[in-house]
Amino acid sequence: MSLPKTSSGAAACAARRVATREEAQAVSAFLLQPGLFGTPLTPGEQDEFRTHPAATLGCADDGYWFVRDADGAVCAVIGIRMNIERTGIFEVSALAIQAASRRRGLGRRLLELALDFVAGSNGRGLLFETSSDPSYAPMHQLLADLGFKQVGRFPDFYYPGEDTLWYYRAIERHPT
C-alpha cells in the first residue's frame, strides 16, 4: 500500500512525511537534541529516536512527520506506529516541538494529523504515552481537549518520581 507523504492534517501545518534517509536523520537529530523534552530521555527513548525514523521508511503502518521553520530547520515532529500486537491500535511514538515554535497550534495540528492517519489506516484508536512531570501539563490539557481520556498511570516508569500516563482516543466510525 502506498501512502501519500502528507494528509489533510499534514497539509494544514505544512507537515511532510519522512520519505528519505536524510529526512529521517534530520528528524532523529531533532528528537535527540538536549533540552527538547521537559525531562531527560531514557536510554530506550534515545535508542528509539536514533533508529525508528529511518526504520519507518516504506512502512504503511508506521511513520514520522516533520515541520520546518522559516529557516528550514526541523521545528516539530510526530511519530506514529501500529502497536506491536497489530490489532488496529496505533501509538504516538514521539511528539516534540521546538520551544520557540510552541503555543502556535502545531501540537494540536500534528495530533489531528495522527488521528487522520489512524482513521485512514482503518485503525481503532490512538494511544499516547506521556510523562507525569508538571512540565507536560500543557500536553495533558491538549490531549483532554482533543477527546483523549487518561486510561492508566504507571508509577516511577521513566525515573523514580516520574510516572507515565496513558491517554487513549477511540476512532469514531461513521456508516457510509
Question: How should each PLM-predicted stretch be described?
Answer:
Residues 118-131:
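Conserved GNAT acetyl-CoA-binding A-motif
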Residues 130-140:
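Short, flexible, glycine-rich and Lys/Arg-enriched loop motifs at helix boundaries
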Residues 86-88, 136, 158-163:
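Short acidic/glycine-enriched loop/turn segments that link adjacent beta-strands
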Residues 97, 103-116, 141, 145:
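Conserved acetyl-CoA-binding loop-helix of GNAT-fold acetyltransferases
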Residues 1-22, 169-176:
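Conserved N-terminal entry element of GNAT/NAT acetyltransferase domains
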Residues 18-93, 98, 111-113, 117, ...:
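Acetyl-CoA-dependent GNAT
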Residues 93, 98, 102, 131-133:
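Residue-level recognition of the GNAT/N-acetyltransferase active site
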Residues 129-131, 144-165:
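Conserved catalytic-core motifs of GNAT/GCN5-like acyltransferases
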